[in-house]
């Protein structure tokens, strides 16, 4: 399991970074759009 961890670590890190890189801005834009709609009203 330790041998595979060294091989899986970089792939898992890149995948984790890509998911957060897409998820964080998405949540931020959704929050900004929701806030703008409430401000207009």
From Swiss-Prot:
What are the transmembrane regions? 16-32
UniProt keywords (A-Z) are: Chloroplast, Electron transport, Heme, Iron, Membrane, Metal-binding, Photosynthesis, Photosystem II, Plastid, Thylakoid, Transmembrane, Transmembrane helix, Transport
Q: How does it sit in the membrane?
A: Single-pass membrane protein
The record lists heme as bound by: 20
Report a single Gene Ontology molecular function.
Answer: heme binding
Briefly state the protein's biological role: This b-type cytochrome is tightly associated with the reaction center of photosystem II (PSII). PSII is a light-driven water:plastoquinone oxidoreductase that uses light energy to abstract electrons from H(2)O, generating O(2) and a proton gradient subsequently used for ATP formation. It consists of a core antenna complex that captures photons, and an electron transfer chain that converts photonic excitation into a charge separation.
Instruction: Give the family, as the similarity comment puts it.
Output: Belongs to the PsbE/PsbF family.
Please report the name of this protein according to its UniProt entry.
Cytochrome b559 subunit beta
